[in-house]
C-alpha cells in the first residue's frame, strides 16, 4: 500500500511488484553511511530563510522533489527501472537547487563513480543530516568495487532488503 496525495486529498493504492523487480531493487540500490553528519536544523537554515524570503528557486527545487516522488511511485508501480533511476536523479537535482551544500560532502566522492559509469544515481537519504546515501549501481558487477572504494574512504556499507511484512504486532498472554 502507498498513499498518494492529490491536491488536498490522499489516495491509497495497493502496491504489488514482481519478484524480479523486487530483486532488481535489492541488487541495484545500495545504502552507505558516510559518517558525515550535520545538525539538520543548521544544514537547512539557509533553505528555510530563502523560502521565507520568497526565493522562487526554492519552490522550483521543491517542485522537482515532488515530481521525483511521483516518478518514483510510477516507476515502482510500473516496474520501470529507468523511471526509478531518473526519479533519483531528479530528486538530487531538486535538492541541489535548494542548496548545493546539502549534497556537497557526498558529491565529491560520488561524482567520479558517476562519471565512470559505476553509479547511475545517488541521493542523501532523508533530510541528509544523518549522512546516509542511497546509490543505484549501474551493474551488479560493480558492487564489490564500490564497497571497497567507499569503505576505503571511511564509509560503511549498510546491507538491506525489502521488508514484505512491515510492522507485525502480536500479543502474548502471560
Named regions from a protein language model:
Residues 3-123, 134-174:
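C-terminal nucleotide
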Residues 125-131:
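Short Gly/Ser/Thr- and Asp/Glu-enriched loop/turn motifs at secondary-structure junctions
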Amino acid at each position: 500500500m502507498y498513499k498518494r496525495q492529490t491536491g488536498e486529498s490522499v489516495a491509497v493504492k495497493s502496491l504489488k511488484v514482481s519478484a524480479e523487480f523486487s530483486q532488481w531493487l535489492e541488487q541495484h540500490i545500495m545504502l552507505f553511511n558516510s559518517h558525515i553528519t550535520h545538525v539538520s536544523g543548521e544544514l537547512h537554515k539557509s533553505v528555510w530563510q530563502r523560502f521565507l524570503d520568497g526565493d522562487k528557486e526554492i519552490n522550483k527545487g521543491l517542485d522537482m522533489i515532488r515530481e521525483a516522488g511521483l516518478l518514483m511511485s510510477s516507476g515502482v508501480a510500473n516496474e520501470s527501472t529507468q523511471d526509478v533511476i531518473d526519479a533519483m536523479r531528479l530528486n538530487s537535482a531538486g535538492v541541489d537547487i535548494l542548496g548545493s551544500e546539502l549534497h556537497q560532502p557526498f558529491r565529491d566522492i560520488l561524482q567520479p563513480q558517476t562519471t565512470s559509469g559505476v553509479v547511475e544515481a545517488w541521493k542523501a537519504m532523508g533530510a541528509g543530516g544523518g549522512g546516509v546515501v542511497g546509490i543505484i549501481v549501474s551493474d551488479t558487477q560493480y558492487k564489490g568495487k564500490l564497497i571497497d572504494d567507499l569503505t576505503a574512504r571511511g564509509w560503511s556499507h549498510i546491507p538491506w532488503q525489502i521488508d514484505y511484512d512491515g510492522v507485525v504486532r502480536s500479543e502474548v498472554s502471560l
